């Protein structure tokens, strides 16, 4: 058993609201430096401990962005490379791009640069997915990824987004969270947006 205690840091008030929200699709908006990637990593760590065996996926557009904003900070916070294995809070498998916790929880890291790459997500199943910088993705990408959030276990099934104004996905993000105009198969009660205190 790891002998270390995880320090989650101190979230800002809006980050606390995002972290404790239980809507099915929760978005966190704000400018650069607003703590969007940090809040994703924090939520992923909390859920990994709170729900043993849970599977979570963090998605960014490119692998370098994924590495810089999530893999490096999370493996560092969880001391995945500590020379004393008893102080490691989790194990990182670079070939599988997966962090595994002693309780069986997993955080998977995936990138999605183009719509033609969606085939790589065929058959993918997870309990929670994080779409970081969601406005960089098309609506078809979002809907395909949202369909991966499923399963028969008792874990919560949610999608968390972070977003900035602009980008190829600006209109669908605005439709869901600002204009709140929904298609026939969408539930207005599923979606909620928080904005960063630093925005």
Regions found by a protein language model. Name each.
Residues 1-196:
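Phosphate/NTP-binding elements of NTP-utilizing enzymes
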């Amino acid at each position: 058993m790891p002998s270390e205690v995880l320090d989650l840091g101190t979230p800002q008030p809006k980050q606390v609201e995002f972290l404790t929200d239980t809507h099915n699709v929760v978005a966190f908006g704000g400018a650069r430096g607003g703590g969007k990637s940090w809040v994703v990593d924090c939520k992923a760590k909390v859920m990994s401990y709170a729900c043993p065996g849970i599977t979570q996926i963090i998605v960014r557009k490119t692998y370098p962005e994924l590495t810089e904003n999530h893999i490096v900070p999370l493996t560092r916070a969880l001391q995945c490379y500590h020379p004393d294995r008893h102080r490691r809070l989790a194990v990182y498998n670079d070939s599988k791009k997966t962090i595994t916790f002693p309780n069986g929880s997993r955080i998977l890291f995936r990138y999605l640069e183009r719509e033609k790459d969606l085939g790589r997500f065929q058959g993918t199943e997870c309990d929670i997915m994080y779409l970081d910088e969601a406005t960089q993705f098309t609506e078809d990408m979002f809907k395909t990824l949202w369909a991966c959030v499923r399963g028969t276990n008792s874990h919560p099934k949610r999608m968390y987004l972070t977003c900035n104004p602009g980008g190829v996905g600006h209109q669908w993000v605005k439709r869901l969270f600002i204009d709140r105009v929904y298609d026939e198969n969408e539930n207005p009660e599923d979606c909620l947006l928080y904005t960063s205190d630093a925005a």
